[in-house]
Swiss-Prot record:
It comes from the Bacteria. This is Cytochrome c2. The lineage of its organism: Bacteria, Pseudomonadati, Pseudomonadota, Alphaproteobacteria, Rhodobacterales. Cytochrome c2 is found mainly in purple, non-sulfur, photosynthetic bacteria where it functions as the electron donor to the oxidized bacteriochlorophyll in the photophosphorylation pathway. However, it may also have a role in the respiratory chain and is found in some non-photosynthetic bacteria. It comes from Fuscovulum blasticum. GO terms for molecular function: electron transfer activity; heme binding; metal ion binding. Keywords: Electron transport, Heme, Iron, Metal-binding, Periplasm, Photosynthesis, Pyrrolidone carboxylic acid, Transport. Belongs to the cytochrome c family. SUPFAM superfamilies: Cytochrome c.
Amino acid sequence: QDAPTGDAAAGAKVFNKCQTCHMVVAPDGTVLAGKAGKTGNPLYGLDGRAPASYPDFAYGDGIKELGAAGEVWNEADFLQYVADPTKFLKTKTGDTKAKGKMTFKLPNEKEAHDVWAFLNSLAPAPAAAEAAPAADAAAPAAADAAAPAEPAAEGAAT
């Protein structure tokens, strides 16, 4: 997955519009963002995740179809979805009757980029999450590093 292009701090402010319906809750149950919004699906770990894949959430048919087809969330699709959920679903599924359950729209592209960056700042990237067990073994070395991201950045350049 590519690094988000938005401003996470600005996205935190824009997320105030989203928290009426959505929350970001870590796997351990810690609420990272949002209040009591349960109308919309949880948004933790969205990058690289299949649409409609959070358990115990009543998704619409169109978004479930995308998840079943093997699609995964990325920044470009997120931007299109939040700009117009129904249009996105019709385009992606090819079903002219597809309808998004999310009625709110965020057509401002900069704000959408910022929200994506904010959501990504709250959850590990898919590659980082998969590498977590190996990272535990290297914990003593990581403790000596100036910044946790430096080893990954150096490794990515090779």
